Structure formats: structure tokens, C-alpha cells
């Protein structure tokens, strides 16, 4: 569990001896495109609050989304006015526009429009979108025309994060009739978490994190959590001031194959995996555990017929071996050949 980097002795027991979550349990029966409930266990005591609070803060503050940043209404010079033939005043119309949820697949600002001329209710479904923008809640009420008049609007949509008040859109050109809007970019509607007790064997002093996420539909709850975890990982990885290595169980030091976890040299066929998972790994040309752990989870999910169920199965097995996806093993193929030669000589 010790290895050297230059003159420093790195003690990997600091992280290797901690219990690690086996998998994220996705409650598929209750989950929808806008709601997700996830269980994450086992965790060391106190980690439930630490991880839950960090994820919640990042989910609510840092994910990108689309929103209106400005509107122009034909015949209207400012928001503190009324429009003849429309029930709502301009202030109420703007409040309704802020409730329209959008999805956008580009970072470039987009311009949309709305035109109606018949008496009746105007909703977000009347907004004329393009190939880059989708209205997620077309039923959202915008205005009520009490007579046959023309209502024309032009919108600018941008990507952003968090909440940006109208006065912060400083780069928008000041012009008569342009009304800047407060923009709520966050695709997350709400996040809650609770920490419960978890059991590992006969020990019950572990945490289970139960996380619930509500989104506007522009991102799935599962992806929202994944993005937030990635943000946290990227922000704190700068504190790791050494190259991570995989230390063996015997505390050996050195640069040969002896300082690696022996499980890395196992063939895929030696693992107690389902036939489906094994076949998926073969189709991805993965023949050893060492090759497997150097893959990223996202890359594995791109493999044909490889789904979340197979991923969770393999992650649980790797965890039991003290391994995980995304590991860095310099010169693994060379070390694997050395290990095979050693096994051959010993036989």
C-alpha cells in the first residue's frame, strides 16, 4: 500500500482502506425524464452529508441551461405599460415568459419570434422556434387576447448558468423597445437529500445517501448528477500533487509488475460476470482487467449493447477487487507480459 514518487513515500492506505460505494441505485420505477431518486451506499460515516451537500450546491448553481435574455414587443417601449386588446399588462406577460423552459443545442445566441392575430389564449406553443431551440413546456400561458389584434414578439435566447438579473446583461444593445429579462438558466428545479444508515456485513455505522432531483426536462436527473460530479472532480483534482499508482496488497515498492494489484492481470473470462457483460467486453476488444480499468465509464456506455445494468455489475466487481474505472497504469501491456513470463517460469 506504499509506493515512491521521487523521494516521497506515498501512502495509498489513506484512500484504499476506505469503504467505497458499490453502485448508484437508480429507482427506475419512480423515475421520469424530470424526476429521479438515487441511492448511493455504503459511505464512510459523515460522507453522506459531505457529498450530498456538495452535489446539491453544484446541481443548483453550476449546470448550463437556456433562457430568454430579452424581448421586443411590437408597439411597446417599456415594460410598465399595457397593450390594448390584451388582458395582461406587459409586466405580467414578462413574468409569464420567465416561466417558459427551453432546451438549446448550441452556445450561439438564438433569435425566436411569436405572432398571433386571433382572439384567444397565447401559449409558449405559439413561439416559432428553429432547429437549435425547443420549448419544453408549450402549455405555458403567455397572454390573453380579448379581441382580434396583432401581437408580435421577438426573443433572444442564450445559454448560461444560475440566475442572472436583467441589469447584468450588459452586452445587450440598448435600444428603444428592447426589454432585458431576468434569466433563470438552471435546468434544475429542486434538489433534496437525506442521509440514512447503511450496513456493511455486521457493521451499521456507515452512511447511505438518498438524492432526489427535479429538472425542467432539458437534462435528465441522472445526467445532471453525473455532470455535477464531474464538475466537483475537476475542481478538486488540482490538489492531488502526485501521480496515482495502483499498489499491491503486500506493500511492495518498485516499478515492476509486483507493485500492481494481481487482479489486473486476470482475463475477462475468469471473472464471474453475466454472459451479456462478458460478450460486451469481448466486442470492445478488452481481454484483461487491467485494460478494463483504464477505460472511462462514459466510453464503456458507448459500447454496443452495453447498458447501465452491465456497467453497475462490472463496477461492483471492480470495487470488490479494490479497483475502479478511469485508472492510470503506465506501461500496463509490458508489465502484463512480464507477469505472464513469471507465471510461466513458476509453473
UniProtKB/Swiss-Prot annotation:
Homodimer. The RNAP catalytic core consists of 2 alpha, 1 beta, 1 beta' and 1 omega subunit. When a sigma factor is associated with the core the holoenzyme is formed, which can initiate transcription. GO terms for cellular component: cytoplasm; DNA-directed RNA polymerase complex. Belongs to the RNA polymerase alpha chain family. The keyword Transferase applies. Its EC number is 2.7.7.6. Keywords: DNA-directed RNA polymerase, Nucleotidyltransferase, Transcription, Transferase. Residues 255-347 are annotated as: Alpha C-terminal domain (alpha-CTD). CDD domains: RNAP_alpha_NTD. Signal peptide: none annotated. It is an enzyme of class 2 (transferase). It holds the Pfam family RNA_pol_A_bac. The N-terminal domain is essential for RNAP assembly and basal transcription, whereas the C-terminal domain is involved in interaction with transcriptional regulators and with upstream promoter elements. This is DNA-directed RNA polymerase subunit alpha. SUPFAM superfamilies: C-terminal domain of RNA polymerase alpha subunit (SSF47789), Insert subdomain of RNA polymerase alpha subunit (SSF56553), RBP11-like subunits of RNA polymerase (SSF55257). The keyword Membrane does not apply. The gene is rpoA.
